[in-house]
């Protein structure tokens, strides 16, 4: 078998008949499969052992040779080679066809490659192939030209003979008529009898004339057809063709069926045709030029490759190995077989019948019919259902052909090559394991025993608990006592991988150290639930076991959960306290003035209370019941660093780091701060979820990951402990309805009645009434919400949950205790009657009914969203899978400018710097492309420095507003990106490693939150067209589609002339440079004019006489990215796409770094359309990689030629995926047959650069530790190491002392030996 590690590229091409015969181990001659009595394969049949190899290892068919000692012998009786049975998986056979057939992919695919090659319309080609028309394959023009006059004379003679014969016949008939009439007259016959005879005679004469005219017309048609006869001409009329063959057979040849196509291909001159087509492209216009371009693609493909076009017509059909189309016996003696066997049987049956008919010399019509049936059966074998009705099996089910085996989700590519089942794995329900450390998981004993079975068995033998592996296996299966001790030893420090489906991003698989637990459920650490998106309502997880030392090392170093605290999408921590833990820490750090033991200053009669010399003393007081954990106290601290603002004051008073200081805080906060690492400033705040998140964020920036992991573990333990101690419970008594609710609703009800009256009087129309009511009831709902918040006491547990950030929000509390408010109908519009009841009071029947619309839509949306989001992720992964960090620095000077702050002038005229809201996702974690300097030109941060939070703060403090940073958009690495342009890896907080699969991480980061995005297109008040939002908008942007209701953009800078019609606007821009006016016609008024800031600082819609800049949007809506590219160029379209995608995600509160979106956008803009090919090899109109385009142009210019001209093109992600260089990757994505057809014709070679290609062929992927840079490392010893390994003694060494020993590697002193014995 082929070893995948020994080849570097994979080429696909067309196989000739000789290739097929060379692959084959014998011809399949019979349609038989297995003998139903002996259950052995039939000789020369589809499962024949002689062709495909023995069914049993080392045993021939007749049983003469058995056992391995006869290896390689071919049995003289049955002809079977004695070898392993597994050769039946790789040996192919073939069927020798009695007549050639065309390959359906090349004839029926769109576009028809055969049609383009031969310049025949697919309809005509079909007529030829399926025996409905003859085609002229060759014409001897010279001979015809030379003999044309002779032939014409002959034809004229024949025509004259026909005419003479006609005249003679007519003359004779006329005479006979005269004689008959004369006779009748003599007999005195009546006039009507005479008339009848005359009519009869004239009719016969007319028929004679018609017959001879038809004969003359036929001769004319034959002659005309013959004189105009040209190759590739179709003749549908069989009689005409036969006549032509009989008369002029020596001047031309013609045929029908695949034989005709084969002859046409054999006579085809590729070079001459290519030259003609190039000439047509140079001089032609319109459709003619387009068709020539398309044809040239196919012709050039054959011209530039080793392929012969003859491969599209088959003389032999390969038969795939029998083990790949098995036949198995079921209970009850029936057989289940692969559909392919049925399809092969049809081909063999028809082929054998055709051979017999040809041998018998059957009439041509019968033979042609059989040939057509053979063609159809081969079509069905290759691609059933592509032409005509599919061949069906039992129960009218279409049979699965070879193409169907490759296509779709169940096809070979996606089902078996890109996703395989894995051994050493298990799955079980998950339960929470709060006692675990962050890097641990609980593994059920029985599952661990099964997973680690081989390891346990080996260890049992090593420790002499068992004599051999067999007895060790028995011990494990019987679960002897020693087994458990050995299992404990074996699993120590052997990480396992846990995976929860769906694995939406890379944190869906993480490594943990297993801890054995009782029961059958896997225990999961509560902090990793966020990354897995797991909860404990019945979720299941799979466990996988890394076996080799390398796999274990990768799992431990790269995948251990404590090393994956940060989100790869935003670089912010994911392993953060949630839910109960947040509640516990919030409770712990709350301050309640006047609680038990609270600090009180010294009075007249009483000493100062609530002052403690150390945290230990305060804890003792709490244990005694003299102090509440939430009471404000003063306590002397030595271990913790004071907060920054306190520290500044203390320094002024002569305090030194390490001295004690007094904090005014609560015991809870002191306990909380003891959980934080040493040296972290004291946090004297109530711990809302956001504050906790900011602290962990800060820890991740400042401390090593191991410290962060230990800290979040401590926070988890404290959170659970204090959540339990807090006793937060929720009951009906806690749901308090605000007493002002009735009064508020009455007030707004009167307001609504007023609107109704105005509507009744006709003062308002339907839409205005609706809008007014919606506004009124929204205000009412908000007011009830406010009243509710004021009414709830601070210690109410229901409001504690949203306030602490643990779960829920105040809207849900409002629904529970206030009022539900307005709901939408199925169209997504507000129903103007609100739901006035709260869930506590209960809804009326009508309220309940209208509420169900929204609830049902929500569920339907979620289901649709999940599928759409998954598909989007799949396309994103496919387009970006070969973006891998290939080198440290590409050396480019280019970069992009990013705004980090904006200058704003206040009312007092002072300029203040406002930090940019999106700094987290734009400038953060990037590398500087140029020195960042302040106003005086001092360098603040040097080029090549990483922009972390401290560096950004420094720049903001110095008043810097814009920085130039490196970006993947400007990276010049050939394939993939360089580490400096990519910047910091969001998941590790350090510069990205070489080998990181940046593209896949980007795709996952964008796809994973996809499910959270909304589906619906929302109505904006009064706008007729819906504005697309949510997931459909992201898809629309990445697919580079023209948006729905697109807004025009200004092509030039100039003044606007606005004309308003009844339903449309007409905008004309008069350019500043005096160029031609640009007119935008028929702009719907429903779309509204764009509102923007004008020169005078006001914000208003576009008006007549306004000045617009190039690229400015003129109407509301979304701009077309293709227009932006055309008008503004590639850089602006990149900015546009990144901002528009971020707009959608930000609206849902999802944080994704710009660099991920940039990776995808870079892939969309990778190609160039060739406008003029110059002296290059490119075809005009073809798409090519920008890097290839530039390198080819450099080569041509160096040789003194004309470079090609091209323009950048924006491709949607699906199109870009299919246009990838790797045919394996494209075929496994979509449109498998089309991609393979194209790749085979072009004889495409796959360099195996991406990830999918390598997964498919089973090689290590060229990313991470599989990248060549790491695989090709060899150890070079240093000089010191070499000296230590190979010591050469000097003469002073003790080796030359009298006790000189052997085997020291020293020189032998020959003079000390006597040689007398040897002489």
Swiss-Prot record:
Which InterPro entries does this one have?
DNA-dir_RpoC_beta_prime, DNA-dir_RpoC_beta_prime_bact, RNA_pol_asu, RNA_pol_N, RNA_pol_Rpb1_1, RNA_pol_Rpb1_3, RNA_pol_Rpb1_3_sf, RNA_pol_Rpb1_4
Supply the SMART domains for this chain. Answer: RPOLA_N (SM00663)
**Which residues does the record give as Zn(2+) 1 binding sites?**
60, 62, 75, 78
| Gene Ontology annotations of biological process type | DNA-templated transcription
Residues recorded as binding Zn(2+) 2, renumbered to this chain, are: 890, 971, 978, 981
Question: What binding details are noted for the cofactor?
Answer: Binds 1 Mg(2+) ion per subunit. Binds 2 Zn(2+) ions per subunit.
The UniProt annotation places Mg(2+) binding at 535, 537, 539
Q: Broadest EC class? A: transferase
| SUPFAM superfamilies xref list | beta and beta-prime subunits of DNA dependent RNA-polymerase
Cofactor(s) demanded: Mg(2+); Zn(2+)
GO molecular function terms attached to this record: DNA binding; DNA-directed RNA polymerase activity; magnesium ion binding; zinc ion binding
Q: Which family does it belong to?
A: Belongs to the RNA polymerase beta' chain family.
Subunit (UniProt): The RNAP catalytic core consists of 2 alpha, 1 beta, 1 beta' and 1 omega subunit. When a sigma factor is associated with the core the holoenzyme is formed, which can initiate transcription.
Biological role: DNA-dependent RNA polymerase catalyzes the transcription of DNA into RNA using the four ribonucleoside triphosphates as substrates.
Could you identify this protein by its name?
DNA-directed RNA polymerase subunit beta'
Name the species this protein comes from.
Mycobacteroides abscessus (strain ATCC 19977 / DSM 44196 / CCUG 20993 / CIP 104536 / JCM 13569 / NCTC 13031 / TMC 1543 / L948) (Mycobacterium abscessus)
């Amino acid at each position: 078998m082929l070893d995948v590690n020994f080849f570097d590229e994979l080429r696909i091409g067309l196989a000739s008949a000789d290739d097929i015969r060379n692959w084959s181990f014998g011809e399949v001659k019979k349609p038989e499969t297995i003998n139903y009595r002996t259950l052995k394969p039939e000789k020369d049949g589809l499962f024949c052992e002689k062709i495909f190899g023995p069914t049993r290892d080392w045993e021939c068919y007749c049983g003469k040779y058995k056992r391995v000692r006869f290896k390689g012998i071919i049995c003289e009786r049955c002809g079977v080679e004695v070898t392993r049975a597994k050769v039946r998986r790789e040996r192919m056979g073939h069927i020798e066809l009695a007549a050639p057939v065309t390959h359906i992919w090349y004839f029926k695919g769109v576009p028809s490659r055969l049609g383009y090659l031969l310049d025949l319309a697919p309809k005509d080609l079909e007529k030829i192939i399926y025996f409905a028309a003859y085609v002229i394959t060759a014409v001897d023009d010279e001979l015809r030209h030379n003999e044309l006059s002779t032939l014409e004379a002959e034809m004229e003679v024949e025509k004259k003979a026909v005419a003479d014969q006609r005249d003679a016949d007519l003359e004779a008939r006329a005479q006979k008529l005269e004689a008959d009439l004369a006779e009748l007259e003599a007999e005195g016959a009546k006039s009507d009898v005479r008339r009848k005879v005359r009519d009869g005679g004239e009719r016969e004469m007319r028929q004679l004339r018609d017959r001879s005219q038809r004969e003359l017309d036929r001769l004319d048609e034959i002659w005309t057809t013959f004189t105009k006869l040209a190759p590739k001409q179709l003749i549908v009329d069989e009689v005409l063709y036969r006549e032509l063959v009989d008369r002029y057979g020596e001047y031309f040849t013609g045929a029908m069926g695949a034989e005709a196509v084969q002859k046409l291909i054999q006579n085809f001159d590729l070079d001459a045709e290519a030259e003609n087509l190039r000439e047509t492209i140079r001089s032609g216009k319109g459709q003619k030029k387009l068709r020539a371009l398309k044809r040239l693609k196919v012709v050039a493909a054959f011209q530039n490759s080793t392929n012969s076009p003859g491969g599209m017509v088959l003389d032999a059909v390969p038969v795939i190995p029998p083990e790949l189309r098995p036949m198995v016996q079921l209970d009850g003696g029936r057989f289940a077989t692969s559909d392919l066997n049925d399809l092969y049987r049809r081909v063999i049956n028809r082929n054998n019948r055709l051979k017999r008919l040809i041998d018998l010399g059957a009439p041509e019509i019968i033979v042609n019919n059989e040939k057509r049936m053979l063609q159809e059966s081969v079509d069905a074998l290759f691609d059933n259902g592509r032409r005509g009705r599919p061949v069906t099996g039992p129960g009218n089910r279409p049979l699965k052909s070879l193409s169907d085996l490759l296509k779709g989700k169940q096809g070979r590519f996606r089902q078996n090559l890109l996703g395989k089942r894995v051994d050493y794995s298990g799955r079980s329900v998950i339960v929470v394991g709060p006692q675990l450390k962050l890097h641990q998981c609980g593994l059920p004993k029985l599952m661990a025993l099964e997973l680690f079975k081989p390891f346990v068995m080996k260890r049992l033998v090593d420790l002499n608990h068992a004599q051999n592996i067999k007895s060790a296996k028995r011990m494990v299966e019987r679960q002897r006592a020693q087994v458990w001790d050995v299992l404990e030893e074996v699993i120590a420090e052997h990480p396992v991988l846990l995976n929860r489906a769906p694995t939406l991003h890379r944190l869906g698989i993480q490594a943990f150290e297993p801890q054995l637990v009782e029961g059958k459920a896997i225990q999961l650490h509560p902090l990793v639930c966020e990354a897995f998106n797991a909860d404990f309502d019945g979720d299941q997880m799979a466990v996988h076991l890394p076996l080799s030392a390398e796999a274990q090392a990768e799992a431990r170093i790269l995948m251990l959960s404590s090393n994956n605290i940060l989100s790869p999408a935003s670089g912010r921590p994911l392993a953060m306290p949630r839910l109960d833990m947040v509640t516990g820490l919030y409770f712990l750090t709350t301050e309640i003035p006047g609680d038990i033991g609270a600090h009180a200053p010294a009075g007249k009669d009483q000493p100062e209370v609530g002052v403690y010399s150390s945290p230990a003393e305060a804890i003792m007081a709490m244990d005694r019941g003299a102090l509440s954990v939430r009471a404000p106290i003063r306590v002397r601290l030595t271990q913790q660093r004071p907060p920054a603002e306190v520290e500044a004051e203390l320094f002024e008073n002569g305090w030194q780091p390490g001295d004690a200081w007094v904090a005014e805080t609560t015991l809870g906060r002191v306990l909380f701060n003891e959980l934080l690492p040493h040296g972290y400033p004291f946090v004297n705040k109530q711990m809302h979820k956001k504050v906790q998140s900011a602290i962990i964020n800060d820890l991740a920036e400042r401390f090593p990951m191991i410290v962060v992991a230990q800290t979040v573990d401590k926070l988890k333990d404290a959170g659970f402990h204090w959540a339990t101690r807090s006793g937060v419970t929720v009951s009906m008594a806690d749901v308090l309805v605000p007493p002002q609710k009735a009064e508020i609703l009455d007030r707004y009800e009167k307001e609504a009645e007023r609107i109704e009256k105005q509507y009744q009087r006709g003062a308002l129309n339907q839409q205005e009434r609706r809008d007014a009511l919606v506004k009124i009831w929204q205000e009412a709902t908000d007011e009830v919400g406010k009243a509710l918040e004021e009414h709830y006491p601070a210690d109410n547990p229901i409001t504690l949950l949203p306030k602490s950030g643990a779960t829920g929000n105040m809207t849900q509390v409002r629904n529970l205790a206030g009022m539900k408010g307005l709901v939408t109908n199925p169209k997504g519009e507000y129903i103007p009657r609100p739901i006035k009841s709260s869930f506590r009071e209960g809804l009326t029947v009508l309220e309940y009914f209208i509420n169900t619309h929204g609830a049902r839509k929500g569920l339907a949306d979620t289901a649709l969203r999940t599928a759409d989001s998954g598909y989007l992720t799949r396309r994103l992964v496919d387009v970006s899978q070969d973006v891998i960090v290939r080198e440290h620095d590409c050396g480019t000077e280019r970069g992009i400018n990013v705004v980090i702050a904006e200058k704003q002038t206040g009312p007092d005229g002072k300029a203040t710097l406002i930090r940019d809201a999106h700094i987290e996702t734009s400038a953060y974690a990037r590398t500087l492309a140029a020195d960042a300097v302040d106003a005086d030109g001092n360098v603040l941060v040097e080029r090549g420095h990483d922009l972390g939070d401290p560096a950004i703060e420094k720049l903001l403090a110095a008043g810097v507003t814009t920085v130039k940073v490196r970006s993947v958009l400007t990276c010049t690495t050939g394939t993939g990106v360089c580490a400096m342009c990519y910047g910091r890896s969001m998941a590790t907080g350090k510069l990205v490693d070489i080998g990181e699969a940046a593209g896949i991480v980007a795709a996952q980061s964008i796809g994973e939150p996809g499910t959270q995005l909304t589906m619906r297109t929302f109505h904006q008040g009064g706008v007729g067209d819906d504005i697309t939002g949510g997931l459909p908008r992201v898809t629309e942007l990445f697919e580079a589609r023209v948006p729905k209701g697109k807004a025009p953009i200004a092509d030039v800078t100039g003044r606007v002339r606005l004309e308003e019609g009844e339903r449309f606007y007409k905008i004309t821009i008069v350019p500043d440079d005096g160029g031609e006016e640009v007119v935008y016609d028929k702009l719907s008024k429903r779309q509204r004019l764009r509102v923007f800031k004008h020169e005078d600082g006001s914000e208003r819609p576009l008006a007549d006489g306004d000045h617009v800049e190039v690229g400015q949007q003129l109407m509301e809506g979304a701009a077309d990215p293709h227009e932006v590219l055309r008008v503004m160029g590639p850089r602006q379209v990149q900015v546009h796409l990144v901002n528009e995608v971020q707009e959608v995600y930000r609206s849902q509160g999802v944080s994704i770094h710009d660099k991920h979106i940039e990776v995808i956008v870079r892939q969309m803009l990778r190609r160039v359309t060739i406008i003029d090919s110059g002296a290059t090899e490119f075809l005009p109109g073809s798409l090519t990689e920008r890097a290839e385009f530039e390198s080819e142009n450099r080569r041509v210019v160096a040789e003194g030629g004309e470079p090609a001209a091209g323009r950048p093109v924006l491709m949607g992600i699906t199109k870009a995926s299919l246009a990838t260089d790797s045919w394996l990757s494209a075929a496994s994505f979509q449109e498998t047959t089309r991609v393979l057809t194209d790749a085979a014709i072009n004889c495409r070679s796959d360099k195996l650069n991406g990830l999918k290609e390598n997964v498919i062929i089973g090689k290590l992927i060229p990313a991470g530790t599989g990248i060549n840079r790491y695989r090709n490392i060899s150890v070079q010893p240093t000089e010191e190491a070499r000296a230590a390994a190979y010591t050469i003694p000097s003469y002073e060494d003790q080796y030359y002392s009298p006790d000189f020993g052997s085997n020291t590697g020293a020189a032998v002193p020959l003079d000390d030996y006597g040689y007398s014995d040897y002489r």
